[in-house]
Amino acid sequence: MNTSAVSPGRAGLLLLLGGQMLPLIDTSITNVALDAITHPLAASATQLELIVALYGVAFAVCLAMGSKLGDNYGRRRLFMWGVALFGIASLLCGIANSISALLAARTLQGAGAALIVPQILATLHVTLKGPAHARAISLYGGIGGIAFIVGQM
């Protein structure tokens, strides 16, 4: 394992912050889509609640594991695997033809998000110092608020 820290630079910081938006937008965007999901999949109120909740549960359950995997196998690798898993799970959500398939895909999305998020914050903490670190963490927090709002649009 290579433990040397290389500053991500401006492009890297933008990539990390963009990656931060994916899981956070997905936290709130599903609420907007619930009406559109109800009729084609004949989803009950309980199933609609599960569509929202399973993502958060999978994210919370896998978050510490995602952080440890990033420490052991490399943050860049885990970030890329997380984005890939998240993207594939998003595609599966889009083509789901049953409520069970959608629930499974939402769970996978949460697991993918749990691989993405810890790599971002760890990379920022390890690679940046002083004012650059403070600015990056401020942007990280600001992106969280913006992403949640964007998801509701």
Named regions from a protein language model:
Residues N2-M153:
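Transmembrane-helix bundle of Major Facilitator Superfamily
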